[in-house]
């Protein structure tokens, strides 16, 4: 889930048009769920892989309406935009090439619906906290310090540092 929050220092200043420009090498259909959610469900031209892109806007203040596959946000104080995407591709290390569904997995429409519903209940701050926790767990596993003694050299003027280097 990608979460983007738009806000302003003054109330009622968020006026947005949200739409999705589909992949040009696919055939699909845009559907609307309520007045604040878009779903693009499509098949790629070259391999018929199904994919889905779902966009939901959650407003504080103002209004959201749907206009032919576009979400129109008017006079909102804040807008949270959630985006989910998925394909039906399934890794298969022992494929049966006679089976046309050998690489077809889960339904991307159902997956994106489940993910966006879960994210919608959390709010931006909780999503951000979960992102930090996930990110920190992955990227704080390693630390690297090069030449701790160099910290004292940072106080020296550049010309002295260059002289030491030569």
Label each residue range with its predicted role.
Residues 1-166:
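Aromatic-residue-lined binding/catalytic grooves and analogous aromatic/hydrophobic interfacial grooves
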């Amino acid at each position: 889930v990608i979460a983007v929050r738009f806000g302003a220092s003054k109330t009622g200043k968020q006026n947005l048009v949200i739409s999705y420009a589909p992949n040009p090498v696919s055939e699909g259909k845009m559907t609307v769920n309520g007045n604040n959610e878009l779903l693009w469900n499509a098949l790629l031209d070259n391999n018929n892989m199904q994919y889905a892109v779902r966009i939901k806007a959650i407003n504080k203040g103002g209004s959201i309406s749907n206009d032919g596959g576009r979400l129109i946000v008017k006079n909102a104080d804040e807008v949270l935009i959630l985006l989910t995407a998925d394909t039906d591709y399934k890794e298969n290390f022992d494929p049966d090439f006679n089976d046309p569904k050998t690489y077809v997995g889960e339904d991307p429409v159902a997956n994106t619906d489940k993910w966006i519903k879960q994210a919608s209940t959390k709010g931006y701050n909780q999503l951000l906290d979960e992102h930090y926790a996930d990110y920190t767990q992955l990227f704080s596993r390693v630390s690297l310090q090069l030449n701790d003694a160099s910290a004292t050299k940072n106080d020296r003027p550049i010309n002295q540092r260059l002289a030491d280097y030569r």
